Amino acid sequence: MRILQETSLAAFHTFGIESQAYALIEAESVDDLLLIWRDKQYQTLPKLVLGKGSNLLFCDDFSGVVVLNRIKGITVNETQESYLLHVGAGEDWHGFVQWTIEHNMPGLENLALIPGCVGSSPIQNIGAYGVELQDICQYVDILNIDSGEVSRLSRKECQFGYRDSVFKHELKETHIIVAVGFTLKKEWEPKTTYGPLAELNKTTVAAIDVFNAVCRIRQSKLPDPQVLGNAGSFFKNPVITQSIKDALLYQYPQMPNYKVSNLEYKLAAGWLIDQCDLKGMQIGGAKVHEQQALVLVNTGNATARDVLLLAQHVVNAVNDKFGVLLEHEVRFMGASKETTLSEVLA
């Protein structure tokens, strides 16, 4: 456990917006986490566990303890059919994906270059290019803060949904993810039907080819947080009913849409925003990225309020034009707890 002297949060979330915490502590084990939660100095203070802070906007100074999860380690077992990986929550996600490719354990390559740590991947049920975490997650190990016990949730118990899981709801305040288990099948089948990956030859493509293609695509479309502060996709792709989809298609026949179920369809939030001519739109130091409308960026001097006002402008514009209400994928953190766009701007 390491207590950091610096309490600025700018370097610990990818938006890079200046805000302060009461305390910043690195935890490298379950014992470290328990020590922090049971320390009388911090016991009554709000606490927030962070990995890379890649899906978060601090809307205010945080009045409590920000705990940086640095639990590391990768353990591999195998069966005749699969590799079974047990991974510490503090491992860098892209570094882990790269590790699996280097060790000839494909299956995660479509999820390359997603920022964040392994422990945050189940919270959002991260996904990209036709693959979601739930497709390869076997279990999630969680620490019960009150009892100090570590238990294991099966994939089903994680209640995965679109950018959603039980960790955003019932377990949000009571448990901490400490490790994630993955099952990677030895008989690898490439997932190349989504977007530009369809150009790859499915019969000859190797996992490293998919990995490299995904990295190229993401680097060409998404800004580097080291250059322009951002949290990746700011909004969820909205899911609508078939009747609403049909009505919109009548008016906008070129509108991308993807079938989710017999009754629901997913729209591309980036396309909706782009149709509102919002690329390059700027409020203060916050801006809609000029290449990818789904991303809001910190041009260098943005405040949290700049980002919030810009996000609300985008939501209003899309709702006015399409009658579709965008939800933010990025988590908003207030002074003591998580909040929402509507709450923070009320």
Curated annotation (Swiss-Prot):
Localization in the cell: Cytoplasm
Chief subcellular location: cytoplasm
UniProt xrefs under HAMAP family: MurB
Family: Belongs to the MurB family.
Chain's role: Cell wall formation.
Top-level taxon of origin: Bacteria
Membrane-spanning segments: none
Organism of this sequence: Photobacterium profundum (strain SS9)
Catalytic activity: UDP-N-acetyl-alpha-D-muramate + NADP(+) = UDP-N-acetyl-3-O-(1-carboxyvinyl)-alpha-D-glucosamine + NADPH + H(+)
UniProt cross-references to Pfam families, sorted A to Z: FAD_binding_4 (PF01565), MurB_C (PF02873)
Protein name: UDP-N-acetylenolpyruvoylglucosamine reductase
Biological-process GO terms, alphabetical: cell division; cell wall organization; peptidoglycan biosynthetic process; regulation of cell shape
InterPro entries per UniProt: FAD-bd_PCMH (IPR016166), FAD-bd_PCMH-like_sf (IPR036318), FAD-bd_PCMH_sub1 (IPR016167), FAD-bd_PCMH_sub2 (IPR016169), MurB (IPR003170), MurB_C (IPR011601), MurB_C_sf (IPR036635), Oxid_FAD_bind_N (IPR006094)
Biological pathway: Cell wall biogenesis; peptidoglycan biosynthesis
